[in-house]
A protein has these predicted regions:
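Re-entrant/interfacial helical elements at transmembrane boundaries that shape
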Residues: 140-152, 168, 179-193, 321, ...
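Alpha-helical transmembrane segments of multi-pass membrane proteins
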Residues: 87, 118-131, 157-174, 334-347, ...
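Hydrophobic mid-bilayer segments of alpha-helices in multi-pass membrane transport proteins
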Residues: 17-29, 40-61, 84-90, 122, ...
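Juxtamembrane and boundary regions of transmembrane helices in multi-pass small-molecule transporters
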Residues: 2-3, 169-172, 176-234, 392, ...
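Hydrophobic alpha-helical transmembrane segments of multi-pass integral membrane proteins
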Residues: 85-94, 116-148, 326-366, 371, ...
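Core transmembrane alpha-helical segments of multi-pass membrane transporters/permeases
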Residues: 46, 50, 58, 69-102, ...
Length: 439
């Protein structure tokens, strides 16, 4: 066991439905109590994950508890989980310093000045999509835009869930198409296709859902047309204070790492804040600390989810899903449905679309070649399906970041998901695409 951290763990058995019990317990515990209380914010997700993690550690009596704990800890500390946590930490610090310098209020004023009130939700969706398309990460985009969306909703008297939902949806749409996103890289590499080709195939599926999403967000139910924003004035100070956001978009086009972008944003917020006399260096440090601490719940959930996934994989749960999927495939159409089912279920259990694509990708390539499915189509199905699933689970990174940054208005995961139109429309578009595909 001393060398556990230095090698990749293989499942102790080929496949086992029993390994999925902890996740089933999580679903029953979290959804069950939430439905009983009719309040999804009453049951902390951390408690649900602790409960299911305890069950995961109890399973497999053939191994000692110490070994299972080490395996669980190894999953908590995996590279992708730690990178995600670093993004959470930097996002918290960036948001806190941006709020302190007045960048959020300035961005709200600019948005109110240029976007009519009845189109504000659609406008946020488009802005979020463009930033995510440039930066290549939905998480980084959500971290930057959600504070603006919340403040904007409060100033316009709108339901914050509308704007936060539009932000998350737009970020996922942009991430799904971006040439530099992790999901694009993972799906194209596993299928050995060009990124541009995958994007073209993605557009065939998600263009109509995205347009429908924008049009639906223009409906009166999502707006407050009685508010007049024509008198909102802005000055040069407002543009200077939003420079970190603008540079985030510009640097994103240069394929710069999102963590580096957030770090640069924190530094710029600090320099601008001190320059405008909003705070001194010590207050800036304090704001950074407060921002990182505000993400603590999100960090805990991410690490517990990583540990739980490691136990499910080690006990043969992922192998079980893969093998059962392969047995249901008999022709080309079945193959496409199978690819979507495979990556979707794995995403459901891992809460990480990149990990789901990397896990399902090699199997998807093998069965796609067997049934003559275009690898560009397979890459697109992997990417789009994982985006759909990631947007409808309350414990995905995108929703967790959004709820953390919208804590001031007490938004639960499900209040955001109910207003998150894009993933649902994408799922519908994906289903239509699968049904209409040639056999």
């Amino acid at each position: 066991m001393n060398n556990l951290e230095h090698k990749e763990l293989k499942p102790w058995r080929d496949e086992s439905f029993k390994a999925l019990i902890p996740f089933i317990a999580f679903v029953i515990f979290y959804f069950g109590f939430s439905i009983i209380t009719q309040d999804f914010s009453r049951v902390p997700m951390t408690v649900a994950f602790i409960f299911s993690s305890a069950i995961a550690l109890i399973l497999n009596h053939k191994e000692k508890l110490n070994k299972k704990i080490e395996i669980f800890a190894l999953g908590m500390g995996k590279k992708d989980i730690m990178i995600m946590c670093l993004i959470f930490v930097l996002a918290g610090a960036f948001t806190a310093t941006a709020q302190a310098v007045g960048a959020v209020d300035s961005a709200v004023a600019i948005a109110q000045h240029f976007i009519p009130a009845k189109f504000i939700v659609s406008g946020i969706f488009v802005i979020s999509a463009l930033i995510s398309l440039a930066v290549g990460t939905s998480c980084g985009t959500i971290a930057a835009v959600v504070p603006i969306a919340v403040t904007l909703a409060q100033s316009l008297g709108l339901n914050p869930a509308f704007l936060v939902g539009a932000t998350v949806g737009g970020a996922m749409f942009g991430d799904n198409l971006s040439l530099i996103s992790d999901t694009t890289i993972a799906s194209t590499r596993t299928q050995n296709v060009e990124m541009r080709d995958k994007m073209i195939y993605n557009l065939r599926i998600v263009t109509v859902p995205a347009i429908l999403c924008i049009l639906l967000y223009m409906l009166p139910v999502f707006s407050n047309s009685n508010i007049d924003v024509t008198n909102v004035t802005i000055n040069i100070d407002a543009y200077i204070k939003v420079m970190p956001y603008i540079l985030l978009l510009i640097f994103g086009l240069m394929n710069i790492n999102v963590m580096f972008l957030l770090l640069i944003g924190i530094i710029l917020n600090t320099v601008i804040g001190i320059g405008f006399g909003e705070f001194d260096i010590w207050t800036a440090f304090s704001k950074m600390g407060d921002g990182t601490v505000s993400m603590a719940n999100t960090l805990i959930v991410a690490m517990l989810a990583g540990g739980l996934l490691q136990m499910v994989r080690w006990n043969g749960g992922i192998s079980y899903i893969i093998n059962k999927t392969e047995h249901l495939i008999h022709n080309k159409k079945h193959c496409e449905f199978g690819v979507c089912f495979l990556v979707g279920v794995i995403n459901l259990f891992t809460a990480n679309n990149t990990v789901a694509i990397i896990t399902a990708g090699p199997i998807a390539k093998e069965i796609s070649e067997k049934y003559n499915v275009d690898p560009r189509r397979t890459a697109s199905l992997l990417d789009t399906t994982s985006c759909f699933v990631q947007g409808i689970i309350p414990y995905g990174a995108q929703i967790l970041i959004a709820t953390s940054l919208a804590a001031s208005v007490s938004l639960s995961s499900f209040s955001i998901i109910k207003c998150l139109l894009y993933p649902a429309l994408t799922g519908l578009g994906l289903l239509v695409s699968l049904i209409l595909a040639k056999k």
